């Protein structure tokens, strides 16, 4: 008799991934360098690729148009950019920049890396998804060849310590101008394309058979790659080649486990994960500035305040719904008199 596999709603994994995003922003996580690298550069760094894959997957499954999707993403991005604008202004002021240069810096940041460190995600998603759509005429084979080539170029950031000669000069010149290769062109494009492809072909054997073995092999290869990077670390560790198959096969496995109907709890977890991702720096920065917290103390502090914020927001939403409903009922009663 076959044992029934437990179902793991994607919303719960989104929630866990959002906590990993908080953790990656908390500074040093362990005194032991190897453990710190394992937690921050391998485990936590899988969260954003997972979110990008999900975005590509849900976009392919969505019935809304490209314009509607863009409008929704831009509204969300603009709203939270306004929230973080004072922090971005203050940070640039600490760099002793004149007000005019701060304005230019924030305007440039809005279109490239965001006005605060986590908001780079929106320009990357928007531009990456635009690339996915604009290169559809190539077919998947050539699309993936292009996306993988760009991702490998992006990996120069991680493997910069291994570079020399003209390649090193090229990378340094690029970094001087654009700061990072973690953007929609070199980073987001491939993960979004993988998610889009998974959404279109999720029933194919490649995405349904032997997923446990594929995931295990990917994790082993990621461990080997992580060891190579750890021994000779580059400017940053945002890119690793085996982030791609690891997150892709993990999401394919998750999709197989989904219950027939999305539960209320899973929806709430997914919504909470989005708000945690967007709001957590507001609370994290207070812990760093006012209490000099770092590592896991800062992580738990941020979770506590972010959780309180989510709770208050939920209460406010309920009260607002009750007030609107009560007002409508009162008006209807007066009309009927």
Which positions does each model-derived feature cover?
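Alpha-helical transmembrane segments and their immediate juxtamembrane cytosolic regions
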Residues: 1-337
